[in-house]
């Protein structure tokens, strides 16, 4: 029996907060959690460094990132698709 293994890689959606490094973007991912004692919805956030091969994502873009093998000391994610382009001000 040869079955194709289904990939269980995590995907997250976040906003690009930095695109200063070459082929790398910093993505801020926010999530809503309920506080265990006070029952209030609290917004928690994490920053991830994601690989951007063609440097196509810019500051303010909302993108989807997928977990991958370690690409450097801090980079374990790859930018996969653009969800929403940044609004021009």
UniProtKB/Swiss-Prot annotation:
CDD domains: Ribosomal_uS17 (cd00364)
One Pfam family matching this protein: Ribosomal_S17
Keywords: Ribonucleoprotein, Ribosomal protein, RNA-binding, rRNA-binding
InterPro entries, A to Z: NA-bd_OB-fold, Ribosomal_uS17, Ribosomal_uS17_bact/chlr, Ribosomal_uS17_CS
UniProt-listed SUPFAM superfamilies: Nucleic acid-binding proteins (SSF50249)
GO process terms (BP): translation
GO CC field: cytosolic small ribosomal subunit
Organism domain of life: Bacteria
Molecular function terms, GO-annotated: rRNA binding; structural constituent of ribosome
Subunit structure comment from the entry: Part of the 30S ribosomal subunit.
Function: One of the primary rRNA binding proteins, it binds specifically to the 5'-end of 16S ribosomal RNA.
HAMAP family assigned to the protein according to its UniProt record, in alphabetical order: Ribosomal_uS17_B
Family of this protein: Belongs to the universal ribosomal protein uS17 family.
Protein name per UniProt: Small ribosomal subunit protein uS17
Organism: Paracidovorax citrulli (strain AAC00-1) (Acidovorax citrulli)
Lineage: Bacteria, Pseudomonadati, Pseudomonadota, Betaproteobacteria, Burkholderiales
């Amino acid at each position: 029996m040869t079955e194709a293994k289904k990939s269980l890689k995590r995907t997250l959606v976040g906003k690009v907060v930095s695109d200063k490094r070459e082929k790398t973007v910093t993505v801020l991912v926010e999530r809503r959690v309920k506080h265990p004692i006070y029952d209030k919805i609290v917004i928690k956030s994490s920053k991830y460094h994601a690989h951007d091969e063609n440097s196509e994502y810019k500051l303010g873009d909302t993108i989807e990132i997928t977990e991958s093998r370690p690409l450097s000391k801090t980079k374990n994610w790859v930018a996969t698709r653009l969800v929403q382009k940044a609004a021009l001000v």
